[in-house]
């Protein structure tokens, strides 16, 4: 007998939203395990002893991958967000085959997430940057995350919005879905960043 394919929780919930037949329990949960895109070696977190005390050493990449596997197998999340390299590893292991969890890939890495050793990128306005090749990403998953950061600086914000516009055009051509993340500016802009970000998104939602 053929094994019945398990539907993705994300697709089920999105269909409910589209038809208006949703309830409070249908909120979407994504586990962000993409810290290696900017955090480097410390990304998996510190090793802890049995009492929970933090040790000096960091967990390994394999520890990080095992954590993603455990959470995915639990079915407690709808989306597992990963870097392209880790997604390639886990998808090749068949982790998401016949799983209710949808794999998603971080599709850009703006300068404000760069956690380079001795770097000071967090002291500067965020600039758009994208590592991934969209054509190759489609072979892994049709879902990804794109992030933007508003700085209340006309040159920086224009470059960020242009990057998002260009990304959307390319993503559409490859039939890749995405969800959007808006970061707070790493630089103090002197007012509530939430108001700035919300106004930007409403003003540009029909143009980008």
Locations of the language-model features?
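Short low-complexity, flexible loop/linker segments enriched in glycine and/or proline
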Residues: 192-196
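Residue-level detector of anion-binding/catalytic polar loops
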Residues: 177
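Conserved small/polar residues in nucleotide/adenosyl-binding loops
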Residues: 199-208
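Domain-level signal for soluble alpha/beta catalytic cores
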Residues: 186-188
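Active-site glycine- and acidic-residue-rich loops that bind
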Residues: 153-161
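Conserved, mostly hydrophobic/aromatic
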Residues: 181
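Alpha/beta catalytic barrel-like cores
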Residues: 2-153
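Alpha-helical scaffolding segments of alpha/beta enzyme cores, especially the outer helices
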Residues: 162-173
């Amino acid at each position: 007998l053929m094994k019945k394919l398990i539907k993705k929780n994300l697709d089920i919930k999105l269909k409910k939203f589209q038809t208006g037949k949703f309830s409070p329990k249908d909120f979407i949960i994504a586990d962000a395990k993409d810290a290696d895109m900017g955090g480097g070696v410390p990304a998996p977190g510190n090793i802890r002893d049995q009492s929970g005390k933090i040790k000096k050493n960091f967990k390994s990449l394999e520890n990080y991958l095992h954590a993603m596997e455990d959470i995915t197998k639990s079915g407690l999340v709808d989306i597992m967000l990963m870097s392209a390299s880790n997604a390639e590893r886990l998808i090749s292991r068949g982790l998401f085959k016949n799983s209710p969890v949808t794999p998603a890939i971080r599709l850009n890495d703006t300068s404000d997430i760069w956690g380079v050793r001795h770097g000071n990128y967090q002291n500067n306005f965020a600039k758009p940057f994208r590592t991934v090749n969209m054509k190759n990403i489609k072979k892994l998953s049709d879902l990804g995350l794109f992030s933007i950061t508003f700085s209340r600086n006309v040159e920086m914000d224009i470059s960020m919005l242009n990057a998002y516009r260009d990304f959307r055009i390319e993503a559409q051509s490859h039939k890749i879905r995405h969800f959007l993340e808006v970061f707070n500016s790493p630089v103090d802009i002197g007012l509530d960043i939430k108001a700035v970000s919300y106004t930007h998104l409403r003003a540009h939602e029909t143009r980008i």
